[in-house]
A protein has these predicted regions:
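Active-site glycine-centered loops adjacent to acidic/histidine catalytic or metal-binding residues
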Residues: 74, 103, 125, 188, ...
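Gly/Ser/Thr-rich phosphate-binding loop
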Residues: 15, 40-45, 54-121, 132
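Conserved beta-loop-beta connector loops within the AMP-binding
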Residues: 134-153, 176, 194-195, 258-264, ...
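AMP-binding/adenylate-forming catalytic core of the ANL superfamily
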Residues: 35-36, 43, 156, 161-162, ...
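Conserved AMP-binding/adenylation subdomain of ANL enzymes
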Residues: 1-42, 56-57
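Beta-strand->loop->alpha-helix junctions that form or flank phosphate-binding loops
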Residues: 97-106, 125-127, 236-239, 285
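Conserved ATP/PPi-binding loop(s) of AMP-dependent carboxylate-activating enzymes
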Residues: 126-130, 142-175, 215
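Acidic/polar alpha-helix N-cap and adjacent early helical turns
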Residues: 306-316
Length: 316
């Protein structure tokens, strides 16, 4: 199961006596027809759902003014995707902005949300009632000041008691701080602004260390997705003989667009002109699709495994 899908799309609405329309398996062709037939007031989904909506011509003439809430969660929503989705909603009659939340199954789904006045671009809002957030220096319990990036930690009544029969993993993520409370160390990087609004920037596990420099895949992905011909991008670390790892970008183009030398050069120049030298991808690969997990997230681990196998085969 997935905490976001159950908590936001099933449990929450049912507690409020709201009709819930269950879609057992997402079908891009049927989705526009379902939206037109049922006219839901709210939809919740992961970023790949918004990508599908943006690229689906079936939505060209559909009025979405019935929508009051569009909630994104389950995975990182890039700033460029957020901006594109907001334009899409307004051009289809929905005078709203996409809402974001943050949470994980270990904290029983959502722990923060972009309540009114906190839905700033790129933010994940403020803590939900009963929850507390702090930012710690990664791998420690040392709390950091406002504006400084570190590991997002959550404390509250919805945080799990632990992983069943996995004491070592439990001790690694549930840690007691100086305030005497037990905090969930999420493995995600972010910061809290002086006004209390929280920002998620990167999953700690996805960070690429290249020649001692920290390379953040989502920063590169967000930049490449700003190119008008790019639909989706995923960046992973690939083995390098002396830098240990370097970045490689996997790119999916929008419908009707094809890879060509001019486009490849434009994307390379975009990266060179806007990124630190150590963050610029060493390789670019264009694909028709990207692998997905069971929860429709981009499966970056599969891409990493593919690259690892390639490197190992070259060494033989």
């Amino acid at each position: 199961f997935h905490g976001f899908g159950l908590g936001v799309s099933v449990h929450g609405p049912l507690c409020l006596k709201v009709e819930t329309i269950l879609v057992p398996e997402f079908d891009g062709k049927r989705f526009p027809k379902m939206m037109k037939t049922y006219k839901p007031q709210a939809i919740a989904g992961v970023p790949t759902l918004w990508s599908a909506m943006l690229e689906n011509k079936g939505f060209d003439n559909i009025d979405l003014s019935n929508l009051k809430y569009v909630i994104s969660g389950g995975d990182y929503l890039t700033l460029s995707m957020e901006e594109r989705m907001n334009r899409f909603l307004r051009t289809h009659g929905a005078n709203i902005s996409i809402s974001k939340g943050y949470g994980m199954t270990e904290s029983t789904a959502a722990t923060s949300y972009t309540f009114s006045g906190t839905n700033e671009p790129g933010s994940i809002g403020i803590p939900m009632i009963g929850n507390k957030f702090c930012i710690c220096k990664p791998e420690t319990e040392e709390e950091l000041p406002f504006g400084e990036e570190g590991e997002i930690c959550v404390c509250g009544p919805t945080v799990m008691q632990g992983y069943l029969n996995r004491p070592e993993e439990t001790a690694n993520v549930l840690r007691k701080h100086k305030d005497g409370n037990t905090w969930l160390h999420t493995g995600d990087i972010g910061y809290i602004a002086p006004n209390g609004v929280i920002y998620f920037t990167q999953r700690l596990k996805r960070m690429i260390v290249s020649s001692g420099f920290n390379v953040y895949p989502n920063v590169i992905e967000e930049l490449i997705e700003k190119h008008p011909d790019v639909a989706k991008c995923c960046v992973v670390g690939i083995p390098h003989p002396y830098k240990v790892k370097v970045a490689k970008a996997f790119i999916v183009l929008k419908e009707g667009k094809e890879e060509n030398p001019k486009l490849r050069k434009e994307i390379k120049e975009l990266c060179k002109n806007n990124l630190e030298a150590f963050s610029v991808p060493r390789e670019y690969e264009f694909r028709d699709t990207l692998p997905k997990t069971l929860y429709s997230k981009v499966d970056y681990k599969q891409l990493e495994e593919e690259e690892k196998e390639k490197a190992e085969s070259k060494e033989k």
